Structure formats: C-alpha cells, structure tokens
Amino acid sequence: MYAGDDPDILYFTSTRNEAKGTDLNGITGMKSADIFHSKRNEKKQWQKPEPLASEVNSEFEEGACSFSSDGKTMYFTRCRTLPNAPAYAEIYVSQRAGAEWGAPQKCAILNDTLSSVAHPVLSPAGDYLYFVSDMPGGQGGLDLWRINITRDGFGYVDNLGPEINTSADEMFPTFSPDGTLYFSSTGHPGMGGLDIFRAITDSLTGRWRIENMQSPVNSQGDDFGMTFEPGAPNRGFFSSNRGDARGWDHIYSFEFPEVHHVLKGLVYDKEGDVL
C-alpha cells in the first residue's frame, strides 16, 4: 500500500529474515510476517526493503496495512497467538508524528472476542473503515464489512450484503483513486483460488455489479492485495502465488490501458433489427 500521495514508498507484508517474530505460522509453516517498506530512487528503482522502525511490528504477525489520505494514520492487522487460546486477528491503528509511527492501539470494532477482524482500509471519504470478519450475521466464511467513523470513535457495523459476499471467503478490500471497490474472493466465479474482483454501483438500480478482473491479473493461484499508485487509477501492484511450486506469494505490477474515448450505440442487422 501507499501512504498518502507519495508514489515512491511502498508498504507491504513479508516473512523475510528481518521480521521480528520467531514462531512459525501454523498455517503456512513460515515465520511471522511484519510490515516493510521500500523506497524508489530517482532512477525509479525500488531499494532494499526495510522493516518499519517502530512499535508497529512485534513478535506476532502484522500485515495488510492501509493509510489515511494524508498518510498520517495507518490501520493494520495483527494476528496474536497466545498459549491455550485460538489465534485470531485484530485491527490496530498507529499515528505518525514526523518520520516515526507511534505505539499502535487496538481498534474497538467488536464486543465479540471470538471473531477475527482484519484487512482494514478507509473509504475514499474517510468516513468508513472497511474490513474482513468471520463474525456472525454474514453470508458465510469471511465477509466484507464496514463500520462508520464518528467524532467519538466507531459507530455501527454493516455487512456489504449478498451481492458482494458469498458463502465462501471475501477479503483484501481496497479502493482505486476513482473510488472503485476491489476485493478478492473464492466464492464468485473465477479462475481458481482467490481472484480479484471489482464492485461497480449500477447507476440505474443502485446495486453492486461484480466484475472478475480476468487474466493476466487473475490466475489459477491466489491473487489478492490490489493497490493503486496515488493519482493513477490504471497502475499499481498486487500479490500472487502463481507459478511458485512452494505456494509463496510475490508482488506483481500491473498497468491497464488508458481509455481515452468511449463510443456507445446500437448495432443493426440488414433487416434493421437491433443485434
């Protein structure tokens, strides 16, 4: 993810050796992940990633971060593993003062201590926090939810509904610079594993229309974590484990062709009937 409008610093999750945690993840068998960042130099080359030099990273697993539009507030996921307790995910927030990120605070989103909340992202207007949860009341599996942000903290929680959520898993919500919602799903028809979709509001019905991003964005592997370069609705990065026999995730770049003109009309056959 990018912080604010700076296109030359990219934040991402990694289990590389510099990550703090020493325990192995019970699902992946790899060490716990931390949040890293990489800077792009004047030659547009990405430099060696470094872990955040702050209290954001811990012995537990951190990842799936996102930022406010001014780049001064970061939301992220922390997965804690404690003795004699199930592993679960929580959302934390950290404020930046100068170049340093402050001590993170847990977001009081749910009173339910048995449900996980993860993958936070702010709406373009900053008035809602979108996230993923397995809390009761959804469509099944992991669903996309949102909670409104008020002056006093968090307000009510909404499920995004059956047009977006399925009985399988939906996760990794994000927004493009033009406000389009993107997410990954194993429930909508796709190419295999997690596929990336975008949700467009139908101007006539007000309902969501879900579109699969197709190849080459999606593959038979897991494709997720779409992020857009600030001010560029047609390029950015996403993650995928395609082509890796070990199932490890890698970061890929993308760039969509720019649409300069849209031509609409009707096509008739030789009898004058609309095709």
Briefly describe each language-model feature range:
Residues M1-L266, K270-D273:
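Short, conserved micro-motifs composed of acidic
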